[in-house]
């Protein structure tokens, strides 16, 4: 019974609605996990290459591809290099971190047993992360000092003077509703009373 129901459904699709389905398939964009909603970033070329609607083999007639179709085809077959580079960078960073952990924590006799003699001193295993931590703190202090000392205008600057002719922005408190946290039972009671 389900097989005949399924076959009649397919026949219905192949009938008059076939053109409409093709139009929908060509105009919609596959954008997980927000089905039916626009993506926040443009779709990557990898999604368009995974879900091709056009055949990759030429037609039997051997007709030339129109210029607009050729541009669409060039976009569809573009290699998604950003995804590949990101995955390779992930693998390389994990491999580098693993090598660093092995180098820092494995005892020297074990490394010599595996004929690994050319490695840096263990002092660098602590020195490099410590230097990086101090560098981050230094950058934080320098950026704050730069923002307050260089980018902030002095008090004697004309841009800091406020008088009766200055156009100072005023906040309209009445336009914004007061934000109050209510108990969940009160919110539910209010919603149920409205319905």
Curated annotation (Swiss-Prot):
Residues 1-84, 144-195 are cytoplasmic. It holds the Pfam family PIG-P. It is a multi-pass membrane protein. It comes from the Eukaryota. Keywords: Endoplasmic reticulum, Meiosis, Membrane, Transmembrane, Transmembrane helix. GO terms for biological process: GPI anchor biosynthetic process; meiotic cell cycle. The keyword Lyase does not apply. Its main location: endoplasmic reticulum. It is found in: Endoplasmic reticulum membrane. Residues 106-122 are lumenal. GO terms for cellular component: endoplasmic reticulum; glycosylphosphatidylinositol-N-acetylglucosaminyltransferase (GPI-GnT) complex. The chain crosses the membrane at residues 85-105, 123-143. Has a role in meiosis. This is Meiotically up-regulated gene 84 protein. It comes from Schizosaccharomyces pombe (strain 972 / ATCC 24843).
């Amino acid at each position: 019974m389900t097989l005949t129901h399924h076959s009649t459904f397919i026949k219905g699709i192949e009938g008059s609605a076939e053109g409409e389905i093709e139009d929908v398939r060509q105009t919609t964009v596959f954008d997980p996990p927000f089905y039916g909603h626009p993506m926040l970033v443009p779709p990557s070329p990898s999604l368009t290459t995974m879900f091709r609607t056009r055949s990759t083999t030429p037609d039997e007639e051997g007709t030339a591809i129109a210029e607009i179709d050729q541009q669409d085809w060039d976009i569809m077959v573009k290699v998604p290099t950003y995804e590949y580079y990101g995955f390779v960078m992930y693998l390389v960073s994990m491999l580098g971190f693993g090598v660093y952990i092995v180098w820092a924590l494995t005892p020297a006799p074990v490394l010599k047993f595996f004929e690994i003699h050319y490695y840096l001193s263990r002092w660098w295993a602590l020195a490099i992360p410590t230097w990086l931590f101090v560098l981050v703190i230094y950058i934080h202090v320098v950026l704050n000092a730069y923002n307050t000392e260089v980018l902030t205008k002095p008090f004697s600057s004309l841009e800091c003077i406020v008088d009766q002719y200055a156009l100072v922005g005023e906040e309209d408190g009445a336009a914004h509703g007061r934000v109050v946290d209510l108990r969940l039972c009160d919110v539910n009671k209010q919603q149920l009373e409205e319905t």
